Swiss-Prot record:
Gene name of the record: clcA
Descriptive protein name: H(+)/Cl(-) exchange transporter ClcA
GO cellular component: plasma membrane
Keyword set, alphabetical order: Antiport, Cell inner membrane, Cell membrane, Chloride, Ion transport, Membrane, Transmembrane, Transmembrane helix, Transport
Organism of provenance: Salmonella paratyphi A (strain AKU_12601)
Cytoplasmic membrane side: 1-32, 117-123, 167-176, 202-214, 282-287, 439-473
Site annotation Mediates proton transfer from the outer aqueous phase to the interior of the protein: residues: E148
Lineage per the UniProt record: Bacteria, Pseudomonadati, Pseudomonadota, Gammaproteobacteria, Enterobacterales
Amino acid sequence: MKTDTSTFLAQQIVRLRRRDQIRRLMQRDKTPLAILFMAAVVGTLTGLVGVAFEKTVSWVQNMRIGALVQVADHAFLLWPLAFILSALLAMVGYFLVRKFAPEAGGSGIPEIEGALEELRPVRWWRVLPVKFIGGMGTLGAGMVLGREGPTVQIGGNLGRMVLDVFRMRSAEARHTLLATGAAAGLSAAFNAPLAGILFIIEEMRPQFRYNLISIKAVFTGVIMSSIVFRIFNGEAPIIEVGKLSDAPVNTLWLYLILGIIFGCVGPVFNSLVLRTQDMFQRFHGGEIKKWVLMGGAIGGLCGILGLIEPAAAGGGFNLIPIAAAGNFSVGLLLFIFITRVVTTLLCFSSGAPGGIFAPMLALGTLLGTAFGMAAAVLFPQYHPEAGTFAIAGMGALMAASVRAPLTGIVLVLEMTDNYQLILPMIITCLGATLLAQFLGGKPLYSTILARTLAKQDAEQAAKNQNAPAGENT
């Protein structure tokens, strides 16, 4: 009897000790566990909103194209209607941005970078609806923009929204959930979870506070976002180019040449983006009426362009597989490349809510395919496949422009499911990055953020100067 009692007491003591250990562990790790839970919520919400954004944009595009099909036999109706529909959709996006949330204009990625440094505000209650509806208008109009910028900014703002809902006040939680939402947003846009993680670590490395809690939160958010995306869209790669052949070792030097070409193109492209932004700023001078009319004209132009040459309009996801398959001649590839450079500059630099990743991927594909086809003529003994150069070119322009080679490499490989091309991708992207840096090119998003902060400081200084003397004391 005594033995049974002693055994029972010993078991109770062990249970109490275990409970005490668990309680102390929970108390010690309460904040990290709460952050990880909220990261899962942020990732899930970002995945849901990202999928909804994609589906809504596709629906608007299909409705617009369906209306044009109805009058396809009447040219006197078709051309004006193509202009008017795209112009009206674009004007909705420009008006909402200018009137209610100027920070929702453009890509939105520089805004997230600024918010991570506590230099830009995060007003999720106005950015979320404006970015969603405005992006739906501009992308639905057929403008040369991508959905990755909106989903990254939407994801970051959802992170801040969750933080406010759960009433977390710590700077660590604020920073971590913002970064988690941004990573989940990129993953939701491209079905590329690893690229989403690398994007935060590489592109936002000056702003991202790397520690065990933050990186675990980013992982958690990206996992949830990717699961949601695949539930609705399946597990197939987002860009279907088929399985391409490996790049023989004796052709790798050609990829270095391609990287050098993109190393020259990247800084020039960035410079053109900034110059075009300045041109538009001088034109509208901040007046909402001029800004909206300008946006409508650009949107209408894209609508007309979509009738003349569909490959020259839109984000570019539909163009990439066609171009990579070698269905265009070298001359036509270069013509579409130049045309899309112009339309990308007009659409993105005007401040329309939309990203530039997808247009850059399309530009890289066009130039890479043209290079591959030329290489096949000049070096027939190598039997080069144009599609492999298209894949390498997709990541190279991003590497040279955004200065994120790792993200560019992994993003393209995840999107196309051609992991066997990792070596030529590394060679091309490294060559492009090194030459762009040597030529003095600056990362695009960092430069845009610096200009935004300079404008913010100038506006604040002007406000302080115009304020009554009593308000400044």
